[in-house]
């Protein structure tokens, strides 16, 4: 991850994952293969206004509020036979990092493409519909054929979890160059120590330090967290819990 004088100085090496709740694995994947796969995804699952229902009326007539996101075993672009992820899953450095993190018997619980949708691509009626939603999942408003990837727009701080005792790690792979202002992942270091809390989370930004947040679990426990912005090139990997 490129160094930035404005970011907190945090050692994001894998050995510090238990304390930080996140780690930078680095640009360990083949850059050309990562970029080529990004082009393949962009061709098959583009980001533009043509993937969305054209009006609220069309959505209410044809859309749904369930089963609209990529599944573990079906309706998932990455499960298509023409998709080859061996450049990731069989990469020796990736395998070693996952074994160090999760043990030799680790399994990939779920994999999915996440696409960040810029404002210009979101139809006005949808933008108005979700403007007060902190985690605007756009998939309900996307035609069925495109719902096998995940589309988000301006996502708020949240936790990846399925249950209170969740024991998985989320692994992010960048397929192209991601700068700080290009929908980069933002993480509150150490916030995992508070455990699972409900959304929207009790967060307040410091008035003195733009990259520091005050976090509460709403039961009397409080902590301060540094925010990091995860930038990197094609083939870069970052993980968090």
For the regions a protein language model found, what residue spans apply to each?
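Short, solvent-exposed loop/turn segments at secondary-structure junctions
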Residues: 29-31, 114-119, 162, 177-180, ...
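Double-stranded beta-helix
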Residues: 3-6, 178-241
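Active-site region of the double-stranded beta-helix
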Residues: 141-146, 158-163, 173-184, 190-192
């Amino acid at each position: 991850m490129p160094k930035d004088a404005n970011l907190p100085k945090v050692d994001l090496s894998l050995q510090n994952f238990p304390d930080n709740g996140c780690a930078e694995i680095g640009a360990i994947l083949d850059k050309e293969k990562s970029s080529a796969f990004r082009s393949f995804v962009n061709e098959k699952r583009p980001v533009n206004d043509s993937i969305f229902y054209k009006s609220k009326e069309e959505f209410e007539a044809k859309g749904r509020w369930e089963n609209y996101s990529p599944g573990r075993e079906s309706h998932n672009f990455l499960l298509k036979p023409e998709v080859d992820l061996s450049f990731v899953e069989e990469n020796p450095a990736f395998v070693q990092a996952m074994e160090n993190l999760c043990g030799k018997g680790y399994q990939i619980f779920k994999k999915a493409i996440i696409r960040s949708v810029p404002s210009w691509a979101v139809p006005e009626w949808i933008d108005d519909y979700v403007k007060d939603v902190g985690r605007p999942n756009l998939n309900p408003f996307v035609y069925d054929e495109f719902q096998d990837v995940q589309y988000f727009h301006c996502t708020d701080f949240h936790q990846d979890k399925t249950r209170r005792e969740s024991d998985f790690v989320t692994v992010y792979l960048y397929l192209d160059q991601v700068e700080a202002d290009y929908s980069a992942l933002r993480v509150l270091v150490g916030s995992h120590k508070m455990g699972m809390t409900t959304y929207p989370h009790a967060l307040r930004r410091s008035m003195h330090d733009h990259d520091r947040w005050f976090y509460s679990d709403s039961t009397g426990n409080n902590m301060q967290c540094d925010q990091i912005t995860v930038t990197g090139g094609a083939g870069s990997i970052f993980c968090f819990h």
